[in-house]
Amino acid sequence: MPHILPEPSVTGPRHISDTNLLAWYQRSHRDLPWREPGVSPWQILVSEFMLQQTPAARVLAIWPDWVRRWPTPSATATASTADVLRAWGKLGYPRRAKRLHECATVIARDHNDVVPDDIEILVTLPGVGSYTARAVACFAYRQRVPVVDTNVRRVVARAVHGRADAGAPSVPRDHADVLALLPHRETAPEFSVALMELGATVCTARTPRCGLCPLDWCAWRHAGYPPSDGPPRRGQAYTGTDRQVRGRLLDVLRAAEFPVTRAELDVAWLTDTAQRDRALESLLADALVTRTVDGRFALPGEGF
């Protein structure tokens, strides 16, 4: 990043201008269909499940077909677990798909097929934590609640606190920081999604594009971009991990019309047989794979 001299000493704002941020968002936001008007609370909840630890570009390849196929909780609940796992494809973390299916079943059965709008009820649903509950309350039901992801924490750390990164999460502190920034109720949802977009596309972790930032004041810029004083960031490994092996084994089962033999599964990962065995046992324990009475393997519900 080019060095920019600190600005003259001023009393720094402890807010972010919603006018500037919302105007920038209208000009520059990505075309993400789950943010469009008319998207149902259920379809927003589906997007939040998919976006957990997954880039939006990968979700774009799955979400539109998913919500056309299963537009409501009841439609999703009637699908088989195997169909849900197949449709989830290579989004990763397939337990999310299973939990989404369970969540749909609970909403259809206990909530008259309507996604609850109360955060305290939302967090009782399978697979729904505090962040997802708040995202649904904000984006589906337009409530003025803080929605704090990694991108939001980074923007607040830099613009408000003058730090290169946010450090370790603290839910009470992070929620209080964002709640203090939220404008009045009518524009709070747009402000929240714009803050996320700013962190995802401009105020990024490794290569922030400060020249494109719409904020007219940033404490980090004002301080001369001090580097992080925390430990070096580590990239999240995938190659060679148990996650990769689990994915390879599930790929075999998703492609199979009938249960497969152990030998057919074994060829999916020949590098480390102990790791392969461990990955298979974990899939069985998570009920993402079933073993038939004759010792073959299948997706849940297909072990005939």
From Swiss-Prot:
InterPro entries: DNA_glycosylase (IPR011257), Endonuclease3_FeS-loop_motif (IPR003651), HhH-GPD_domain (IPR003265), HhH_base_excis_C (IPR023170), HhH_motif (IPR000445), MIG/MutY (IPR044298). Residues 111-139 form the HhH domain. Its EC number is 3.2.2.31. It is an enzyme of class 3 (hydrolase). It catalyses: Hydrolyzes free adenine bases from 7,8-dihydro-8-oxoguanine:adenine mismatched double-stranded DNA, leaving an apurinic site. GO terms for cellular component: plasma membrane. Keywords: 4Fe-4S, DNA damage, DNA repair, Glycosidase, Hydrolase, Iron, Iron-sulfur, Metal-binding. [4Fe-4S] cluster binds at C203, C210, C213, C218. The keyword Signal does not apply. The active site is at E48. One of its GO terms (biological process) is base-excision repair. Its cofactor is [4Fe-4S] cluster. Adenine glycosylase active on G:A and C:A mispairs, as well as processing 7,8-dihydro-8-oxoguanine:A (8-oxoG) mismatches. Minor activity against 8-oxoG:G and 8-oxo:T mismatches is also seen. Bind dsDNA oligonucleotides containing the above mismatches. Belongs to the Nth/MutY family. This is Adenine DNA glycosylase. It comes from Mycobacterium tuberculosis (strain ATCC 25618 / H37Rv).
